[in-house]
Regions:
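Phosphate-group recognition and catalysis centered on beta-loop-alpha active-site segments
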Residues: 374, 464-756
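A short, solvent-exposed beta-strand micro-motif common in secreted/extracellular proteins
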Residues: 60-75
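Aromatic sugar-binding surface patches on proteins
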Residues: 404-438
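Extended active-site neighborhood of metal-dependent phosphoesterases/phosphodiesterases
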Residues: 74-75, 158-251, 272-290, 299-338
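Short, ordered, surface-exposed loop/turn motifs in non-cytosolic proteins
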Residues: 21-24, 28-43, 60-61
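N-terminal active-site segment of His-dependent metallophosphoesterases
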Residues: 22, 29-30, 71-161
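Binuclear metal-dependent phosphoesterase catalytic core
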Residues: 306-392, 429-443, 447-459
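Short, acidic Ser/Thr/Gly-rich low-complexity loop/linker segments typical of extracellular
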Residues: 43-57
Length: 756
């Protein structure tokens, strides 16, 4: 029995060694013999002796023998890829002769996101300004330097590997490649076969090199199947490789992990497959993951001492635009380790290294139209961003989710204004980001100062003139687009990113405050509860004569009207004021929008019907004010009215309200209509036809803001803008937004993770 067991052991040993073969070699730098250098075939590992020599068994089917390039040295990179590897096929001897780059622990590291080259047009852009920019940067380096291109070098068209290698040499520093999903053979089957062309042109998928006392692990975290199908994660052989490499990593070394896919998939905040296993292997070191794949910029803390920098794409949005679709400029990230301290910045192509912040004026952001927005694409919590309103410290700016107005305008231009054309290429649609911060000043603020300080002491100060934008007010929620004064119209206006919702109030028989312009159900929009249309000439059915329960049964949205051909037709009702404000406030919070403003008209008027078809003005005001003040809207609320009696009453009884005086086209002399008031309101709201330079000047002289109504024609809208009025009321907020911000795209829907 013992003899049989020994025979079986002998057979197993023979089988285990049959696939291995012995190789030898040297690692030198000129005449210098380099000892302690790690050598591997990807499975088996050894180190050179003091003589620089090594000998070990490699797998018989090993594709490469390669080294973990030691600190202070680099393999020749004149081919476009550092020659730290050699083909193992048919060879038993290997010689690696390295170039000495310097001594010490200081260095530069450059991280380059997806180049994604698909055609000659893409390549022509890539070899131009981006390469020139990196080459100019390389000339400024005073320490050993290396670059990493973080995958998706190509966009399935792998013949561009050769052209890429020829051009990347011009940077003047070695650039190490990472395998991306688009660097695989599109129609190959299996992970290993998929990367065959990549390995032929670029070398091993998993390797490492030292910089100073630190180490860079380059990993393939795309588990490829076929035809662009893949899983982001770590295959078992990759984890085994890392386990073996970690045996040679000093305990005091910081680790960079360079890989294509993000470690954490934002915004679902899910770690990729077997991340826990990888983190277990490398835990105990300070770790920085450098990743691409998403084409956006995102800095995330994974756990204590583990951070991920998801680097935006050097191709912008697939070479269509300068900006990535999260609003990060085309660029790359630069790291410098000096005296044990790591600093970094994002380098935008063609921009100075201090170009780190963009400021958007109020009205520019679709999600935060009443805010000053800072886009700090390299933002993390170490940045210090504070703001001041008219000299008063207001504290820190709030980090928010936003989309870039600059990118949207670029895409409008690229797609000739046809934003719907992006539906065919949804991966190019504007992306939500987390690197924007907002300050939301009072609409009566005159100046805002923003002070920014990077984690490394760089400072920026911005002074913002708050008169330098137009407040876009959606008349009845934008009645040219949606049924007027409804929840649907307000929602649409919010999604368009208006500054202010304009609406009107009436009172029901049972004392409820109803959102309605007309005192009765108008024939242009109303259908009775029994399904019969309200027609012109029918007896008027007044709001004040009906209980709200009955009012709510009327359909005020289904009926088409040739005067409003762009308006959507849908069944809806007149809401209560209380209901509408609650809906708006909850919806803005749910969507992550900054708070909206309200310009609300109380529809009092003198006439024979007062007290019969609508309340007496002071009762009307009291009912409305009770609801409005209960909502604590503060300076976000303006109450407007044509009726001087009601305005005088509000000013005396409710001094906390901000008031606007509405005047029509026949108002006549300024001094005469202003004399009807016992006070000076904060706002004057004239019909746009009587607005001219003289009227604007009078308002300026009196210290009143101006909000003309109701302006729909693009030429009239532009005239109001040119007169520099503070706000404009319009039935078509999309038309006005095209003039004030250059786009009228709605805010995006649910957050979706997109990679490509």
């Amino acid at each position: 029995m013992k003899k049989i067991a020994l025979a079986l052991i002998a057979i197993l040993i023979a089988v285990g060694t049959a696939s291995a073969r012995k190789v030898t070699g040297t690692v030198t730098s000129g005449e210098e013999k380099l000892g302690g250098v790690v050598v591997t075939d990807g499975k088996n590992f050894t180190q050179t002796k003091k003589s620089g020599k090594f000998a070990f068994n490699i797998e018989d089917d090993a594709e490469f023998v390669y080294i973990l390039t030691p600190s202070g040295y680099v393999a020749d990179y004149s081919s476009g890829v550092p020659a730290f590897y050699q083909s193992a096929e048919g060879r038993s001897k290997f010689s690696f002769d390295l170039i000495k780059t310097g001594e010490g622990n200081d260095y530069h590291l450059v991280a380059i996101g997806d180049a994604q080259i698909k055609n000659d047009e893409h390549f022509a852009i890539f070899e131009g300004e981006p390469i020139d920019d990196m080459a100019a940067l390389g000339k400024t380096f005073t320490k050993p330097a290396a670059g990493l291109v973080l995958g998706d070098i190509c966009w399935d068209e792998l013949q561009y590997f050769k052209k890429y290698k020829k051009e990347i040499v011009r940077t003047g520093f070695p650039v190490y490649p990472v395998l991306g999903n688009h660097d695989n053979e599109r129609n190959a089957s299996g992970d290993h076969n998929g990367s065959a062309t990549y390995r032929k042109e670029m070398g091993p998928e998993n390797y490492a090199f030292f910089m100073g006392k630190d180490v860079v692990l380059v990993l393939d975290n795309i588990i490829y199947s076929t035809k662009r199908k893949y899983v982001e994660g770590y295959a078992e052989h990759v984890l085994d490789w890392v386990k073996n490499v970690m045996k040679f990593i000093p305990q005091n070394a910081d680790i960079y992990v360079a890989q294509h896919s993000m470690l954490k998939l934002w915004p679902i905040n899910q770690l990729i497959k077997d991340s826990d296993k990888l983190l277990d292997i490398i835990r105990g070191h300070k770790v920085l993951f450098l990743t691409g794949h998403s084409h956006i910029c995102n800095n995330m803390e994974i756990e204590e001492n583990v951070v991920e920098h998801n680097v935006a794409a050097i191709c912008g949005t697939w070479w269509d635009t300068y900006y990535c679709n999260d609003g990060t400029p085309r660029g790359y990230k630069v790291y410098t380790k000096e005296a044990g301290k790591l600093e970094w910045y994002y380098k935008s192509v063609g921009k100075d290294k201090d170009y780190q912040v963009e400021l958007y004026m109020p009205g520019q952001s679709v999600m935060h139209p009443n805010s000053i927005v800072l886009n700090i694409w390299d933002y993390d919590p170490q940045w210090k961003v504070e703001w001041y309103e008219d000299g008063k410290p207001m504290g820190k700016m709030d980090q928010v989710i936003d989309i870039s107005p600059v990118y949207i305008r670029e895409m409008y231009k690229a797609f000739e204004g046809r934003i719907d054309a992006l539906n065919k290429k949804a991966y190019k649609y504007p992306r939500l980001n987390t690197h924007c911060l907002v300050a939301t000043p009072s609409q009566y603020a005159k100046n805002v100062t923003v002070a920014v300080e990077s984690p490394f002491g760089k400072k920026w100060v911005y002074n913002v003139d708050m008169s330098d934008y137009v407040d876009v007010q959606a008349h009845r929620g934008g009645m040219g687009l949606m049924p007027e004064n409804t929840l649907e119209s307000m929602k649409n206006a919010l999604d368009l990113g208006v500054n202010t919702l304009e609406l009107d109030l009436q009172i029901s028989k049972d004392g409820k405050v109803v959102v309605s312009h007309d005192a009765y159900f108008h024939y242009r929009y109303a259908t009775r509860p029994d399904g019969t249309p309200v027609n012109k000439g029918d007896a008027k059915e007044y709001i004040y004569t009906l209980n709200y329960e009955d009012i709510a049964r009327y359909d005020v949205g289904s009926k088409a009207n040739p005067d409003w051909p762009e308006r959507a037709c849908l069944a809806t009702r007149k809401p209560l004021l209380d209901e509408l404000i609650d809906f708006v406030e909850n919806y803005t919070k749910e969507k992550g929008y900054s708070p909206v403003r309200y310009n609300i008209e109380i529809k009092t008027r003198e006439g024979n019907g007062e007290g019969i078809y609508w309340p007496i003005y002071h009762d009307f005001v009291d009912a409305c004010a009770k609801v409005l003040l209960s909502k604590h809207l503060d300076d976000r609320l303006v109450v407007q009215c044509f009726d001087p009696r009601a305005l005088n009453f509000m000013h005396e009884k409710y001094p906390e309200l901000h008031l606007s005086y509405l005047v029509d086209a026949k108002a006549g002399d300024f001094d005469k209509y202003m004399a009807k008031l016992k006070f000076q309101p904060e706002w004057l709201s004239p019909h746009y036809s009587i607005v001219d330079e003289a009227l604007v000047a009078k308002c300026r002289e009196k210290g009143m803001k101006m909000v003309p109504w109701t302006v729909d024609n693009p030429a009239d809208l532009q005239r109001m803008i040119d007169l520099k009025v503070e706000a404009i009321i319009t039935n078509y907020p999309d038309r006005l937004l095209m003039l004030t911000r250059g786009y009228a795209a709605p805010a995006p829907g649910p957050i979706v993770m997109r990679t490509h």
